[in-house]
């Protein structure tokens, strides 16, 4: 494995360890970003189930996104996952940035989810 991927895995493990300690039973809002898309899930770690999810390739966002890899797409995905989480009865989450720095698309997802009504 390359050094960059190993470093990402170490950061991800470190972030998840801190989240597990601070979660207090709250579901986590997990972000995965690739070079072309962004994916967000609300996961209940106690039950091991995904409560809500959204991505830039979602059918609900099909016509309105120019690309799945920009801040505008991340904002739309954040709003969509907030709607779906509220419909599933989730209002408080803990944000899992998955080892990515809190900047750009990751920050846009978090801010849009907050605007959509999720608390973290």
Curated annotation (Swiss-Prot):
GO annotation, biological process: translation
Keyword Protein biosynthesis included in the entry's annotation: no
Gene3D superfamilies, sorted: 3.30.420.100
InterPro entries: Ribosomal_uL18_bac-type, Ribosomal_uL18_bac/euk
Record's protein name: Large ribosomal subunit protein uL18
Self-association and partners: Part of the 50S ribosomal subunit; part of the 5S rRNA/L5/L18/L25 subcomplex. Contacts the 5S and 23S rRNAs.
Keywords recorded for this protein, A-Z: Ribonucleoprotein, Ribosomal protein, RNA-binding, rRNA-binding
Function in brief: This is one of the proteins that bind and probably mediate the attachment of the 5S RNA into the large ribosomal subunit, where it forms part of the central protuberance.
Family: Belongs to the universal ribosomal protein uL18 family.
A GO molecular-function descriptor: 5S rRNA binding
A Pfam family this chain is assigned to: Ribosomal_L18p
GO cellular component: cytosolic large ribosomal subunit
